[in-house]
Amino acid sequence: MMEGQQHGEQLKRGLKNRHIQLIALGGAIGTGLFLGSASVIQSAGPGIILGYAIAGFIAFLIMRQLGEMVVEEPVAGSFSHFAYKYWGSFAGFASGWNYWVLYVLVAMAELTAVGKYIQFWYPEIPTWVSAAVFFVVINAINLTNVKVFGEMEFWFAIIKVIAVVAMIIFGGWLLFSGNGGPQASVSNLWDQGGFLPHGFTGLVMMMAIIMFSFGGLELVGITAAEADNPEQSIPKATNQVIYRILIFYIGSLAVLLSLMPWTRVTADTSPFVLIFHELGDTFVANALNIVVLTAALSVYNSCVYCNSRMLFGLAQQGNAPKALASVDKRGVPVNTILVSALVTALCVLINYLAPESAFGLLMALVVSALVINWAMISLAHMKFRRAKQEQGVVTRFPALLYPLGNWICLLFMAAVLVIMLMTPGMAISVYLIPVWLIVLGIGYLFKEKTAKAVKAH
């Protein structure tokens, strides 16, 4: 593709394989693990490890379903394109807009977390101030070009990977060398009331919050339109997700919960930072706080990228205003970045009005949108595969356990919604789902009416 052709309608293919790999990783290691895991530990105890394994398996199935579609048709807008093409125009419209809203909400949650991490050092700084500062900085960087985004995300993710691996190694050394003190023992995983101290119910009730940690893995699909070689980079990035889950989620939590009894974890501080702080290692606690701050900024950076590309894809499909389907001479969709930023700025207001409850509220809304998102990926994939089979096409990167895997994912989503209805503070976000679907329906009818009026003239 020539440079001159990219101005107006085409995104620039500026992401290398290493960028794709690390963007997937950036989506997987964020606030869900570093901050969200605190409330899960309080309810499920060491059983959180099993919870992450179950949710990780579901996330991997979803990733493979999306991966199969993206390898066959690498386009901007990712799965909303597949919902549109293989399911119907309303499905494409609804899934695209839901995905955009999902990542606006994730962006808000990450900015809120940034404020909490800054308060570890400066408790007097309100969360909304930190959110506002980083909001401006990250959006300004994303207005440059996709290579700058790719490089920034690459280094953000490198920092996270090195830090988590170092934390596992250092934690393991403290554990087995005796330098972690008398309380550091693998027996902490079952001694403090058992592996599941509140029974299996305690774990089940936390599955919605655990699911929050995995939102972002599907970013790989969004990068497809700007990947140099999607046929190779997408399968590679997708398959490596399972190892990341094992190492970064399960490995780090197993070490962490062995170093100190899970009962010492508090809900409003990163357990990663807290445990090393409690062990008296201030240097490591400060270093880890830098890492969790980097993690939140990394995911927010990915959100800015993702939101703008999804909105760009919607505009190309005719599901968003045409002005959003343009890029500047560098191949950057400036209009969609600015529109997404404008809505995300509400986060600053939410943190100003309700600093204590902002993160919990945003997390609940994210999970509801994520349930819709993952369910639509699974359903769109079933229709995609059926269409390909009828055409006699053998796909290059088939999903696992089709169609059983799809039904397992859909049942899991339904179970998460039921759990949320039973969880104080989360039920409201489930009640908002029908309202949101009605809003989408009205938006779709308005779009169709406008399109017909334009054709008539």
Swiss-Prot record:
Positions on the Cytoplasmic side per record topology: 1-19, 64-86, 139-155, 223-240, 293-333, 380-399, 447-457
Pfam families, A to Z: AA_permease
A GO CC term attached to the entry: plasma membrane
Transmembrane segments: 20-40, 43-63, 87-107, 118-138, 156-176, 202-222, 241-261, 272-292, 334-354, 359-379, 400-420, 426-446
Biological process annotations from GO: amino acid transport; transmembrane transport
Primary localisation category: membrane
UniProt-recorded name of the protein: Aromatic amino acid transport protein AroP
Organism name: Shigella flexneri
